[in-house]
Structures are given as structure tokens and as C-alpha cells.
């Protein structure tokens, strides 16, 4: 079983931000998006989604995008493409489904981060953690764009955060969801948030302010 933790009498630390990009094909577009976002607030990690391309092109994109992200103190994780993460200098990969997670663990651990998403059940989440995943994510949309009800997502996040030591990432589809997900160690800001018409800096600053307000409530 995944490691369970005893009940805590201390306040839970404020959740940190985890940015999810839209599918990017151009390193300059990534810089234009991530540079202002990472300067606006403390960000723990960036989940980089890449537009389809051949392997060499993908590696070159990651190699260009990784250093500025890492220089800001954020981990760069690649969505899928576990085999490219180490070769391109990323900090790890985020995989969807327990089978993909377990395969990535064999090739990336212990040097790199392996995150687990697309977990259909509590059992899958516990299995991912037991297998060695560094975090589990709840609430992200499936390939068809569907996600569980928000109430179910919040319940799953609160259950996990209360019981297990492995961190969880709660996926916020909108800024309004952030305040309801603060039990998680990390809040993932969806591509629609990061691509806010006000600009990435304003969106990330807004998200950080909401987290700060919840921590003081």
C-alpha cells in the first residue's frame, strides 16, 4: 500500500503552483508564455506539452525550453515522452495511466521525477504511489476533454492529502477552482488559465494571490 501518514496537528503548508502549457511547437512561443509566468510568482514545476513532431525536433525544443525554466527554480516535466526527458535535459516526465507510469519508473528513477495522472480509481492512485511515483494528479481532463465532477475531484484531493505522504497535484481548470483545492501540495493551472487574455503574468499572479488568501483564511 502507499505510505499513509498519521493525523497532523500542524498547519499544512501553502500549496505551490504547477503550470500546464498548451501544446507548443515553437521555443520562442514557450519563452513568451513561460518567461512572464515564472517571473510573476513562485512556481514549483512546469508541465510542457509538445505539439507532434519527429524525435529530434522534440529533443531540440526541450533543450531550448528547459534552461530558462530551470534557472527560475522550477522543474521542467515533459507530458508523455518519458524516453526523451533525460536525453533532452528535462527534470522528469508526467505519464497518463498506471501502465505508462510503471514503465517510466523503470527508465527514469531515481534521477528524474515521474508524475502520475489519468488515474481512474483510488486503487490506481495508491498503486502509482506504491510503485514509486513522485506525485499523483487528480482532476485533469481525459483525451476527450472530459473530467470528473468538481465535487469528486475535491473529495479525491482531500482524501489523498489527509491520508498519504506522497504529494498530490490538484488540476484547476479555472481560477475559481483554486480555493477549493488547497488541500493539495500543488495546484496545476490549466492551459486555459496560463493562456489568460490578460497575459500569463497576470494569470499566475492572480492564482498566487488566491492561494495566499486561502492560507490566511
Regions found by a protein language model. Give the residues of each.
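Active-site mouth loops of central-metabolism enzymes
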Residues: 13-31, 113-120, 170-172
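Glycine-rich phosphate-binding active-site loops on the catalytic face of alpha/beta enzymes
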Residues: 19, 97-104, 135-148, 180-210
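Short secondary-structure boundary segments
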Residues: 23, 50, 97, 118-119, ...
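Conserved beta-strand positions in the central sheet of alpha/beta enzyme cores
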Residues: 45-47, 77, 94, 137, ...
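Glycine-rich, proline-tolerant flexible connector loops at the mouths of alpha/beta enzymes
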Residues: 45-57, 140-147
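Alpha-helix-loop-beta-strand connector modules within alpha/beta enzyme cores
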Residues: 59-78, 97-120, 148-175, 207-217
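Catalytic cores of alpha/beta
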Residues: 76-91, 120-132, 163, 167-189
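Histidine/lysine/aspartate-rich catalytic loop segments that bind and position anionic ligands
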Residues: 115-148
Amino acid at each position: 500500500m502507499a505510505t499513509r501518514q498519521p493525523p497532523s496537528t500542524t498547519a499544512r503548508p501553502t500549496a505551490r503552483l504547477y503550470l500546464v502549457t498548451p501544446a507548443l511547437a515553437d521555443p520562442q512561443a514557450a519563452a513568451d508564455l513561460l518567461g512572464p509566468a515564472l517571473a510573476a510568482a513562485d512556481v514549483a514545476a512546469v508541465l510542457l506539452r509538445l505539439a507532434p513532431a519527429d524525435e529530434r525536433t522534440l529533443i531540440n525544443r526541450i533543450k531550448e525550453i528547459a534552461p530558462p525554466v530551470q534557472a527560475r527554480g522550477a522543474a521542467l516535466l515533459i507530458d508523455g515522452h518519458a524516453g526523451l526527458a533525460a536525453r533532452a535535459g528535462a527534470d522528469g516526465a508526467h505519464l497518463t495511466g498506471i501502465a505508462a507510469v510503471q514503465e517510466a519508473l523503470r527508465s527514469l528513477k531515481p534521477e528524474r521525477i515521474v508524475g502520475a495522472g489519468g488515474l481512474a480509481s483510488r486503487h490506481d492512485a495508491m498503486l502509482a504511489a506504491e510503485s514509486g511515483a513522485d506525485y499523483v494528479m487528480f482532476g485533469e481532463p481525459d483525451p476527450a476533454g472530459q473530467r470528473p465532477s468538481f465535487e469528486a475531484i475535491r473529495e479525491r484531493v482531500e482524501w489523498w492529502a489527509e491520508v498519504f505522504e506522497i504529494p498530490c497535484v490538484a488540476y484547476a481548470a479555472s481560477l475559481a477552482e483554486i480555493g477549493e483545492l488547497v488541500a493539495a501540495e500543488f495546484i496545476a493551472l490549466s492551459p486555459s488559465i496560463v493562456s489568460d487574455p490578460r497575459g500569463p503574468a497576470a494569470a499566475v499572479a492572480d492564482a498566487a494571490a488566491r492561494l495566499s488568501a486561502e492560507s490566511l483564511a
